[in-house]
């Protein structure tokens, strides 16, 4: 029996599955075959929710006596866009000059392929693992993330599963393999402000109520002053206005409504609840500011709607997990990785409620881009890092 020890072969098999979210595309089936060659038992639960597509997931475990390590990730990928723009077809896994091209090469089928190869090499060299390893893999990370990791974790917990540590194989390195381990993530909170006015002729503003003046005032209150200056482990919280809409194409008509959406990435100065309270307080004060409203005395009429569920800030403190992975990266690459909390959210935000979690994978320079690609040397390097980590983690 040949074990899946070659990360490039593993990745090619996964890339050739067109698993554009929410489609499974054969990717979980291909992964399940690899894992069963190593003696893993596997389950493929499907989760549903209102107004979202049904999503297939995979949970596989190889049990032993000792700690339980979870590898987590996703096989769904973003659309490739116009395939004519690609140097090689996005689902062909073509190799040119030591580089493999394909959608998901780094985000994050490459990480999965390397961890599979690392486990296979460990088994080939040492036989049984001194503990348990599980793969918790979803097909709903690039989509709404409703029927994926968050439900798969609860499903597994209800069946008696628990974990001592987890690695998420997202592409964490900005420039080169070994640059960065993610040990936490900022929180994320989104909302929409709607200001109601009175439509009218632009030449007769006294007969109308321009909501644009109100939305500008409210948005300004969220942009300044800064929410904080950052903390020891996190950069400063940052709010970005992502849309401003009035639904009005006429230049001589005052609109009757204006909306603005925003997203804020926040640090451990705040909880989602305390940040919501701060935003509400700022808006309430700003609603009484009539400097842009031509002397009107009534407060700005507005509504605030919170969008989706917030992602909570977290920081992992597990010394064994972080120390073992750091030493493994340094041993293979010769450099000590930065421990970082930068970047966006990931499914680690769900896992942190079940066990300590870190993120480490390939280099993310081409993720979501045309000609997404990975150097075969990086696949081998990441596999060696994972293999060393597995050996040291289980002692």
From Swiss-Prot:
Pathway noted in the entry: Amino-acid biosynthesis; L-lysine biosynthesis via DAP pathway; LL-2,6-diaminopimelate from (S)-tetrahydrodipicolinate (succinylase route): step 3/3
GO biological process, one term: diaminopimelate biosynthetic process
Note on how the cofactor is bound: Binds 2 Zn(2+) or Co(2+) ions per subunit.
Regions that span the bilayer: none
Record field: catalytic activity: N-succinyl-(2S,6S)-2,6-diaminopimelate + H2O = (2S,6S)-2,6-diaminopimelate + succinate
Top-level taxon of origin: Bacteria
Keywords: Amino-acid biosynthesis, Cobalt, Diaminopimelate biosynthesis, Hydrolase, Lysine biosynthesis, Metal-binding, Zinc
UniProt cross-references to Gene3D superfamilies, sorted A to Z: 3.30.70.360, Zn peptidases (3.40.630.10)
InterPro entries: ArgE/DapE_CS, Bact_exopeptidase_dim_dom, DapE_proteobac, Peptidase_M20, Peptidase_M20_dimer, Peptidase_M20A
Names of the cofactor(s): Zn(2+); Co(2+)
Enzyme class at the top of the EC tree: hydrolase
Family of this protein: Belongs to the peptidase M20A family. DapE subfamily.
Name of protein: Succinyl-diaminopimelate desuccinylase
Species assigned in the record: Brucella canis (strain ATCC 23365 / NCTC 10854 / RM-666)
Gene name as annotated: dapE
């Amino acid at each position: 029996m040949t074990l899946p020890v070659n990360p490039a072969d593993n990745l090619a098999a996964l890339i050739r599955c067109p698993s554009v979210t929410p489609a499974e595309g054969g990717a979980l089936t291909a992964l399940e075959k690899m894992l069963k060659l190593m003696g893993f038992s596997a389950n493929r639960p499907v989760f549903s929710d209102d107004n979202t597509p049904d999503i297939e997931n995979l949970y596989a475990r190889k049990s032993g006596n000792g700690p339980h390590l979870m590898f987590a990730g996703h096989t769904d990928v973003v659309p490739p866009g116009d395939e004519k723009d690609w140097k090689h077809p996005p689902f062909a896994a073509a190799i040119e000059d030591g580089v493999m091209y394909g959608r998901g090469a780094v985000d994050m089928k490459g990480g999965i392929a390397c961890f599979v190869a690392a486990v296979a090499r460990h088994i080939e060299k040492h036989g049984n693992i001194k503990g348990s390893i599980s793969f918790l893999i979803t097909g709903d990370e690039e989509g709404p993330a409703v029927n994926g990791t968050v439900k798969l974790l609860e499903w597994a917990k209800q069946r008696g599963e628990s974990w001592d540590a987890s690695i998420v194989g997202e592409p964490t390195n900005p420039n080169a393999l070994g640059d960065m381990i993610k040990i936490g993530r900022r929180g994320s909170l989104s909302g929409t402000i709607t200001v109601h006015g009175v439509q009218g002729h632009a030449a007769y503003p006294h007969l109308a109520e321009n909501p644009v003046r109100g939305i500008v005032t409210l948005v300004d209150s969220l942009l300044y002053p800064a929410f904080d200056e950052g903390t020891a482990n996190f950069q400063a919280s940052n709010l970005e206005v992502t849309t401003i809409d009035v639904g009005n194409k006429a230049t001589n008509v005052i609109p009757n409504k204006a909306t603005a959406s925003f997203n804020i990435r926040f640090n451990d100065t705040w909880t989602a609840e305390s940040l919501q309270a701060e935003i509400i307080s700022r808006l309430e004060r700003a609603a009484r500011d009539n400097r842009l409203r031509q002397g009107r005395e009534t407060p700005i009429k507005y509504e605030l709607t919170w969008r989706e569920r917030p992602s909570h800030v977290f920081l992992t403190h597990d010394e064994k997990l972080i120390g073992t992975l750091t030493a493994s990266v340094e041993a293979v690459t010769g450099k000590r990785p930065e421990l970082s909390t930068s970047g966006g959210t990931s499914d680690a935000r769900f896992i942190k409620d079940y066990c300590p979690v870190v993120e480490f994978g390939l280099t993310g320079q081409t993720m979501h881009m045309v000609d997404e690609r990975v150097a075969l040397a990086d696949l081998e390097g990441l596999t060696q890092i994972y293999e060393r980590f597995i050996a040291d983690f289980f002692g």
